[in-house]
Amino acid sequence: MTTRPGLVRLTATAAVFGLAAAGCAGWSSRPTGITSTSATLHAQTSCLAETTDNPCTSWFQYWPDGVTSVQHTNPVTANVDTNGFVEVRQPITGLRPDTLYRTQFCGYGDRNVEQPGLCIGQRDGALSKPGSQPDAGDYSATQNFRTAGPDTVGTVDLGRALSTADTNANAISRDAGLSAAYSPSRSLWLFGDTVQRNGPAFLAGTTAAAGPHVRGEAPTRLEELPTPPAAPQPGRASPAPFLPRPQGLLTPHDPPAACGTNNSYPASWPTGLAQIPGTERMLIVYGELCVAKTGGWPTERLKLVEYDPATNRFVSTGTPFVAAPLQAGLPAAQLLGSPVFGDDGYLYLFGRQLNPDIVLVARVPADPNAWGNGANYHWWGRPGDGPAQWTEDLTAVTSIISGVTPWSVHVADYTGVGPHRLAMIVKTSFATSGFRLYTATSPTGPWTAGPAGHVPDTCQGGGFGCYAYHGHAELSTPDQFVFSWYSPGDRGGFGHVRLGAIAW
């Protein structure tokens, strides 16, 4: 087994490249066939068969999260020149239902990895010795999956969404993690409040990155974007504020004060984005909030901006909804996101509220001259308790799905991803890991309940647990729905957006 180039990081850097070039390498890849009690573990490995004294030998080790001992599969010796990387797999059984498992690929061989060998999780992850566990706070040091439960299917971790600036030495922590493609090969990512070790101490609001995407994989080569209208600059070492800083907001206090006083700060937080049909421009939806230590975080304005990734410029901006008074915040029906362009000339946006539990949809003509005016919006509702129809009456909105508590909702258009059209991921509980998928061919439904799952994460730490559940149409495949969440415990509690997959 060969630890891929750069894997043997327990030795000096100069020696690493020489050893890796001379011999074996490998890393864990995504498990498959996850049931309540079994899974098949996968890895990529290579061997040069340089010596018979240290033949290429590999196995997997695995354990339920929180358990100190490890189990392992039977070692397999295959001392042949693989002429590059090949896949190896081994099944494991006897697993616990609805349990987070962590796994590593282990081995030794050739002249660069001596016995008893080394173990690695995800590609470029940290190393550990066989029989021992890596740092439990480094979620990329292992390949992670959660087994199916009585009412859930298995989920698997795909890794962190990374930019080239987001390194182990200069780690970036931020939430949100919304994305959409603006071309067949490139996508735009939007993140929330951002900090970086050895970089910006705190950037309020939104930062952004753009780069290539590959279906079924977490992006690892995104480029940080400068503050518009500065032109994109490859190789940036730090994130920068992206959406405009809100002006004129008020604190949610009685009496209110200017936002930025009384332990508060103004922030522009994204609620969704989508490619504008027939262009390589993006529509970005975001709220302007005054984030206060006390009194809540009411959204005081909702904005829609047209963005050109080629020039990193905002082309147009509309503000359809402004709270009155500002400090009271917008009503739930106007807290919209998840833009979806219909083939009927309308732009659809989605939202949710609790108590009563409602997932709502609004529409407006798909024209920048229209979507900036709140008078052009209509909601799917039942005015006068009559039949469902489009209405201007905010108090008449009706839910497009039932039987779920929508702690968060994200919708996107998956047309072209196999037979799928619209898909919605709903976070079904607070601070824990549960979610369910829903699919439809029309924004108003009917929406069909799909698989339920738990993100492959402990969801411990941070005060809010796991949150920011979003689907990614450009990363999903016909049989795997790719989603992301903010993992508060990753990187030793520093926190990071991670991606996962669930069969659909």
Roles of regions detected by a PLM:
Residues 175-178, 240, 247, 255-274, ...:
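Beta-propeller and closely related beta-sheet repeat lectin domains
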Residues 98-100, 344, 478:
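Extracellular Ig-like/FN3 beta-sandwich strand-entry sites
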Residues 69-74, 122-169, 182-266, 275-329, ...:
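Beta-rich carbohydrate-recognition and catalytic domains
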Residues 55-59, 100, 301, 358, ...:
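Exposed beta-strand and adjacent loop surfaces of beta-rich binding modules
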Residues 44-47, 427, 474:
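Solvent-exposed strand-to-loop "edge" motifs in beta-rich extracellular domains
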Residues 459-486:
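Short aromatic loop motif centered on NTY/YTY
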Residues 24-149:
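Short, surface-exposed linear motifs at loops/turns and structural transition points
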Residues 1-25:
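Secretory targeting and sorting signals
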